A protein has these predicted regions:
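Helix-loop junctions on the cytosolic side of multi-pass membrane transporters
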Residues: 129-131, 135-136, 181-208, 314-317, ...
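Cytoplasmic membrane-interface "Motif A"-like loop-to-helix N-cap segments
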Residues: 78-92, 285-305, 400-402
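Symmetry-related core transmembrane helices of the 12-TM Major Facilitator Superfamily/SLC fold
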Residues: 175-193, 404-418
Length: 575
């Protein structure tokens, strides 16, 4: 059955107001920030160097994410979320009122202060925005919801940047910008009033106002989550490292490599943003209405491939002697390949990031989710600062070209992907299962509700062929640790990359790894050609453990049924 379009979520009252609220917030942030940068460069005179002020603006906007994300995470646990969002949006109206006056009077220090306050408001809003999604959407809608949010965010970034340029080109720029930011802030507040109630997960939480201590504690909380969540945070932050690198270098790349003007820069930024929006939307269709982390390896590989192609096409591009605008750039055959590479970067970036956000949300405990998102936001800000430092070192100190910088970060992306998938083999396992389901075998479940959503359980499965591991792993909604009592054949050795381990001997209770996983409440699957015999060995030792038997049955040439039955459960009081 075909999954409904993710756009259908925009017709639901529980999601649309939140989507509009966050979209208008991102739009207003970038409208004001870009207008301020253009005002510094072209409109407001100052004794301080303009480049210093532009970089100071970037610092003032990102600094609050280090300082106040932890506080935003606490707010998201302590207070009812819809009410908290309304309060934050009302604060945005107040900030933009001051910003409108500062723009009208061309008061640079006040404009910079307003930018810092906008960054603070965004830092507090971020943890609430992402942690409320699992409360207003069910798990089957998380991929679509995150895809829409990411699409809206990047289109809002693009839209705010473009509108700021249009408004600042007018002689009446001050009144136009002032009226626009205030109107958008008011519209965002009105939209937030329609967000449904989302109860506070931890209303008894005592707020800690000590910024450094709370930031350290929340980072410790984030990295103390299940390995899949903590490593997803690193993968998520790496995406923002890449995004910051490309977005920062695109203007200089367009001018220095393509000999393009301002409209060429706008074209490239538009292509990149539309690519991310397209990839984000595509995730919902590819995921079949579940949190499909198997898309992450495909996204990572695509990002590196497009990055290498961008370096190759840029290195062989012969710039025209005259300065090119957007239409002139489109007329150049070599430039069209470069634009296609940039679109691919955005497309695969969207496919990469959406499942990571959904994984963090779905596998974080509800009473910690906002703080885990806050930890992720702090890490995002750190990675973006590191991207700027690396770019300065490679461009100014090492002397690389911008195209060579793109090649370096593409190769770094492969290294990060290797680390991520080695640390969490489930990514590769689910990727293999997803590819298999799309090309050869589809699996539908029967009795899957018997598998507990949380806590330890043992699955017994007959193991005949290596593809069965992929089919079983892909059908599960939670991480599975696979062990086999059989000798791995050469094709099956590839499954070790996906985290399948071989056990020596039949008594798996003697395995320290299995015992440790069970004690930690994990889901373990024992693959054996004789699962009944393995169950006989376990029966006297698996105290308090739910044991289920899995069987893959043929259901047509390209379809199987994953049948789950209760093999047994041993009473915790048994001797």
């Amino acid at each position: 059955m075909r999954s409904p379009s993710s756009l259908a979520l925009l017709g639901k009252k529980r999601f649309l107001p939140l989507f509009v609220t966050q979209l208008l917030g991102a739009f207003n942030d970038n409208l004001f920030k870009q207008a301020l940068v253009l005002a510094i460069l072209y409109r407001i005179g100052s004794t301080v160097d303009a480049n210093v002020l532009v970089n100071l603006s970037a610092l003032l906007f990102i600094l609050p994410f280090f300082l106040f994300s932890a506080l935003g995470g606490q707010f998201g646990e302590r207070f009812e979320k819809s009410r908290l969002i309304r309060a934050l949006k009302l604060w945005e109206v107040a900030i933009m009122t001051v910003g409108a006056l500062a723009m009208w009077f061309a008061h640079l220090p006040l404009l910079l202060l307003v930018l810092f306050c906008m960054g603070t408001q965004s830092a507090l809003f971020g943890p609430v925005k992402y942690s409320i999604l699992p409360q207003v959407l069910d798990e089957r809608e998380l991929m679509a919801g995150n895809g829409l949010v990411e699409m809206g965010t990047f289109l809002a970034i693009l839209g705010g940047t473009l509108v700021a340029g249009l408004l600042m080109s007018s002689e009446r720029y001050a009144i136009l910008v002032a009226a626009s930011v205030l109107a958008v802030a008011l519209a965002g507040y009105l939209a937030s009033r329609q967000i449904p109630l989302a109860r506070a997960p931890l209303p008894e939480l005592a707020l800690d106002w000590h910024i450094l201590r709370q930031t350290r504690q929340i980072l410790r909380l984030g990295f103390g989550q299940h390995r899949s969540v903590s490593r997803a945070m690193i993968g998520n932050s790496w995406f923002w490292f890449l995004g910051a690198t490309y977005l920062t270098q695109i203007p200089a790349f367009a001018k220095g490599v393509l000999n393009g003007n301002e409209t060429a820069v706008t074209l490239i930024l538009s292509v990149f943003s539309i690519g991310i929006a397209s990839g984000s939307m595509l995730c919902a269709r590819l995921s079949a209405r579940k949190v499909e982390i198997g898309l992450v390896p495909l996204g990572a590989l695509g990002v590196s491939l497009c990055g290498v192609l961008l370096w190759w096409h840029a290195s062989t591009f012969s710039a025209a002697p005259q300065v090119l605008g957007a239409w002139g750039l489109l007329a150049e055959p070599g430039a069209r390949w470069i634009l296609l590479d940039i679109f691919g970067l955005g497309l695969f970036g969207g496919i990469y990031i959406v499942p990571l956000y959904a994984l963090i949300q779905s596998r974080s405990p509800e009473h910690q989710r906002a703080r885990v998102v806050a930890a992720n936001n702090i890490l995002n800000a750190l990675f973006m600062v590191c991207s700027a430092i690396l770019a300065i070192l490679l461009l100014a100190v090492v002397g690389l070209s911008i195209a060579q910088l793109f090649l370096v970060v593409s190769l770094f992306n492969l290294l990060l992907a290797f680390y991520l998938f080695r640390a969490v083999p489930e990514f590769l396992l689910r990727c293999g299962a997803w590819l298999l389901g799309r090309t050869r075998q589809r699996v539908r479940g029967e009795g899957g509700e018997r598998i507990p959503a949380h806590g330890a359980a043992l699955l017994l499965a007959r193991h005949e062929r290596w593809v069965e591991v992929l089919l079983i792993g892909g059908a599960m909604r939670r991480p599975v640790h696979f062990f086999t009592t059989d000798v791995l054949s050469p094709p099956s050795r590839l499954l070790r990359i996906c985290g399948v381990s071989a056990l020596d001997g039949e008594d798996v209770q003697l395995s320290g790894r299995v015992a440790g996983l069970m004690a930690a409440g994990e889901l373990v699957c024992l693959l054996s050609r004789e699962p009944a015999r393995a169950w006989q060995v376990l029966q006297g030792r698996a105290h308090g453990l739910a044991v289920l038997e899995i069987e893959l049955r043929e259901d047509g040439p390209r379809s199987r049924i994953l049948h789950v039955t209760l093999a047994g459960a041993v009473d915790r009081e048994s001797p």
